[in-house]
Amino acid sequence: PIEDRNASIAHINEALLRIAEKARKHFNDIRIIPRLDICKITCERRGCQVKIEVNQTKRGLVSGDAKLHTLCDKAQELFGMEVEARIVSMPQLYGGKIAAALSRQHPRDLFDVMQMDVPVASVKDGLIFCLLGSDRPIHESFSPNLIDQRNAMGNQFLGMSEIPFSYEDFEATREELVKNVNEIMTDEDKEFLVAFEEQTVDWTTSPYASFRDYPSVKWKIQNLQKLKASNPAKLLAEADRLKKIFGIS
């Protein structure tokens, strides 16, 4: 079960402090900057910086338990060590990556999407979960305003990967992703997402009923309910844009 917000954040920060303490024991010259108000620590050593930040809202596991995965052979060879990490289910992991790629359109996210080794359709549940808890209107993910990311490509991605990824690759990957996420949605999925934006969902019949108990989705529902009360025309306008994209009359 997911703990309440205060208990969850307290336990997250306890875990971050344990990580910080282990790092100090291993590296005498490490500098650690805690920002527990936002569940974050920054570690700096010899010109390198690692940020560890936990999302305070998107808590909980969907589509299965977290499992231990071993660092890939290439990374083990590069860093000279073997590490295991507990990773969320593939639908939740890649669903979150796709949602981020559609929202931020950052080269790093689209590069990861290009390297995905599972079909988009197989992570649909995780994607829908992330869309329901997003701070952006759902229609923006299915018909995003395309952002010119040439500067980000040069300043925030170039040199991060040995695998070639040109700006043309970025644009092609983005176009293919938008096409794929639209194609994998069934008529029932589309009607559900529109009803969610309208706040008219019948949760008793929805295959995604369990999602409403998660903090991020509760938060989004709360905000949509506030909008429905204060500006119902705006709420319906956002839903109508999604209807138009989906071809729902």
Describe each region flagged by the PLM.
Residues 2-249:
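Structured mid-to-C-terminal alpha-helical surface segments
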